[in-house]
């Protein structure tokens, strides 16, 4: 059986746009050919896509860094470079994506075929055909391609099931799942036999069906990570109905009620909204000798319990003899029909949603100074202009200088006290300031 992995961290690096080209027409009988440099192609994006054949994030354990290809550089004769292919990564249904740098939820992938662009490829740089003007009809100006986005993400799988089986270890959750769905979870007479969620489909004679998940057993402190803790609780979030199993064959009614409350306290500690889910209490192992006596007392204690908003419905079953199982499944199906489905936005399978990292309000540029006296310019807008400037051509350098001047960089440097001949650094590029 493959290892179940439901949480993983990955890096995604989109491709850079191709560089624009500086080129001129070289044709017979055209002595003064104009600019003919083409644009660079778009860089490849990183896209997550739901694949219903996947059940775990296991594939990411050994492949956590994903890089898309860069766009092709522009060519002469106004030819645009080819765009790079996008890199598509398959993920299981129910995957939530979080940006670890911002803490923001990037997207929730719940629909088959749903796509999410988690890192957008950079646009191609413009060739010199875009920079011709009456004053400069033959510009040696071209842009470098825009850098692709980089993100550090956490993928978290939350199983999509209509019904979740909850309860302390060894109350019979796996056995019930195997009886009603044909699933084959590991079953044994010791705690935490089930270490991963198991999923199966319940098919009723009337044609109705629903997905049921057997969750690993809860213990006190699970909401704080004790035992299987949070690994289990996240999978309950998407369920519509909870079947709360209590063992009345091997324990008396008072202990069963105490454990019933313990489980609900853990649910409330993790997320109070979970207690609003419809919950059916299922008394298990009713084929054992004292089970009926324990059940009668348990029902009395529930009815007398004033801590409950209302007395829950109680079903008694034996997974061994199958007594009461069909009645429980029919009631569960009815309850599912009355309960709203997990709230997820519908997505058009043909259109990918693109994640845009939130931009904090920041100045176009900032000025600081190194210990050696070099002035340092930084800032997202300024650095983007810099990396897209082709410094191999003097015209491009002059254009960048004009852009800095229009942004107010020159005036700000003078106000900060810069002197003629001082060194200025942008990233790894150093130049001399001239008044």
Curated annotation (Swiss-Prot):
Every copy of the OCT domain together lies at 357-435
Enumerate the Gene Ontology biological process terms: ribosome biogenesis
* InterPro entries (alphabetical): G_OBG (IPR031167), GTP-bd (IPR006073), GTP-bd_Obg/CgtA (IPR014100), GTP-bd_prot_GTP1/OBG_C_sf (IPR036346), GTP1_OBG_dom (IPR006169), GTP1_OBG_dom_sf (IPR036726), OBG_GTPase (IPR045086), OCT_dom (IPR015349)
**Which Enzyme Commission number(s) are listed?**
3.6.5.-
Which Pfam families is this protein grouped with? DUF1967, GTP1_OBG, MMR_HSR1
According to its UniProt record, this protein's enzyme class is hydrolase
Cofactor(s) for this UniProt protein = Mg(2+)
Residues annotated for Mg(2+) binding in this entry: 174, 194
**What cellular-component terms does GO give this entry?**
cytoplasm
Q: Which residues form the signal peptide?
A: none
Give the chief site where it resides: cytoplasm
Q: Where is the Obg domain?
A: 2-160
Q: Which residues form the OBG-type G domain?
A: 161-337
Q: Where in the cell is it found?
A: Cytoplasm
Q: Which GO terms describe its molecular function?
A: GTP binding; GTPase activity; magnesium ion binding
Binding residues annotated for GTP, in chain numbering: 167-174, 192-196, 214-217, 284-287, 318-320
- Please provide the record's keywords in A-Z order: Cytoplasm, GTP-binding, Hydrolase, Magnesium, Metal-binding, Nucleotide-binding
Q: Which family does it belong to?
A: Belongs to the TRAFAC class OBG-HflX-like GTPase superfamily. OBG GTPase family.
Q: What does this protein do?
A: An essential GTPase which binds GTP, GDP and possibly (p)ppGpp with moderate affinity, with high nucleotide exchange rates and a fairly low GTP hydrolysis rate. Plays a role in control of the cell cycle, stress response, ribosome biogenesis and in those bacteria that undergo differentiation, in morphogenesis control.
Complex formation = Monomer.
Protein name in UniProt: GTPase Obg
What organism is this sequence from? Limosilactobacillus fermentum (strain NBRC 3956 / LMG 18251)
Upper lineage: Bacteria, Bacillati, Bacillota, Bacilli, Lactobacillales
């Amino acid at each position: 059986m493959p290892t179940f992995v439901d949480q993983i961290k990955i890096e995604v690096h989109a491709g850079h746009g191709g560089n624009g080209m500086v080129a001129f027409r070289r044709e017979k009988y055209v002595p003064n050919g104009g600019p003919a440099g083409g644009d660079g192609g778009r860089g490849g994006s990183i896209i997550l896509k739901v694949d219903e054949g996947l059940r775990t994030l296991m594939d990411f354990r050994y492949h956590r860094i994903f890089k898309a290809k860069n766009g092709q550089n522009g060519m002469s004769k106004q030819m645009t470079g080819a765009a790079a292919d996008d890199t598509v990564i398959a993920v299981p249904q129910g995957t939530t994506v979080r940006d670890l740098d911002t803490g923001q939820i990037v997207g929730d992938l719940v629909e088959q075929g749903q796509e999410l662009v988690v890192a957008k490829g950079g646009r191609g740089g413009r060739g010199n055909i875009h920079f011709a003007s009456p004053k400069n009809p033959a510009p040696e100006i071209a842009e470098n391609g825009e850098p692709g986005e980089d993100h550090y993400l956490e993928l978290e799988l939350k199983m999509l099931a209509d019904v979740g089986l909850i309860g302390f270890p060894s109350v019979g959750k796996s056995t019930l799942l195997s009886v009603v769905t044909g699933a084959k979870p590991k079953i044994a007479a010791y705690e935490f036999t089930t270490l991963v969620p198991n999923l199966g489909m319940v098919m009723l004679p009337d044609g109705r069906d629903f997905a049921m998940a057997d969750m690993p057993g809860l213990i006190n402190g699970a909401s704080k990570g004790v035992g299987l803790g949070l690994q289990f609780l996240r999978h309950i979030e998407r369920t519509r109905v909870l079947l709360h199993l209590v063992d009345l064959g091997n324990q008396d009614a008072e202990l069963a009620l105490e454990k019933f409350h313990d489980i609900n306290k853990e649910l409330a500690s993790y997320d109070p909204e979970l207690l609003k889910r419809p919950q059916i209490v299922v008394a298990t192992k009713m084929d054992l000798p004292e089970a009926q006596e324990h059940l009668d007392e348990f029902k009395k204690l529930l009815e007398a319990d004033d801590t409950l908003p209302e007395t829950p419905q109680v079903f008694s079953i034996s997974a061994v003899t199958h007594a009461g199982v069909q009645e429980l499944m029919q009631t569960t199906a009815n309850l599912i029909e009355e309960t709203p489905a997990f709230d997820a936005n519908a997505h058009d399978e043909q259109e990918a949603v693109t994640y845009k990292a939130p931009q904090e309000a920041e100045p176009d540029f900032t000025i600081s100074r190194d210990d050696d006296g070099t002035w340092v310019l930084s800032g997202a807008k300024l650095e983007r202009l810099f990396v897209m400037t082709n410094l191999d051509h003097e015209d491009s350098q002059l254009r960048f200088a004009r852009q800095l001047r229009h942004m107010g960089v020159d005036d700000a440097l003078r106000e900060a006290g810069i002197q003629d001949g001082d060194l200025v650094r942008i990233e790894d590029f150093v130049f001399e300031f001239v008044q």
